[in-house]
Amino acid sequence: MLSQKHRLSKSADVIKTTARGRSFFNPYFVLKIAPATGTEPAKLTVVASVRVSKRAVDRNRLKRIIRETVRPSITNFKSGNYAFLLKSSALKLTAAELREQVTKSLIASKALKA
């Protein structure tokens, strides 16, 4: 589980991130990144709507996998707000494949500190 300081939990912040953030597309999710001002820690949220799956079990599984993939390295993220918007095609992936896709997207988006 992500620590409280690394969670993007306010609805207004999530809306700002999804509306104004830079988009990095992937067949399985969209990564939105909104840079923060100052030295705030990186904050993350994972959004899985009912369009992804009607079953909450499936949506929560995907969210857990992404959060646990990011958790060990979130202190190495550049300051900003990060939102993963899941697509229904992510259900077809195994946990290892989804972790690999998340890692590739973070590297491609240059979200990690040098």
Named regions from a protein language model:
Residues 1-114:
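Positively charged, solvent-exposed patches that mediate nucleic-acid binding
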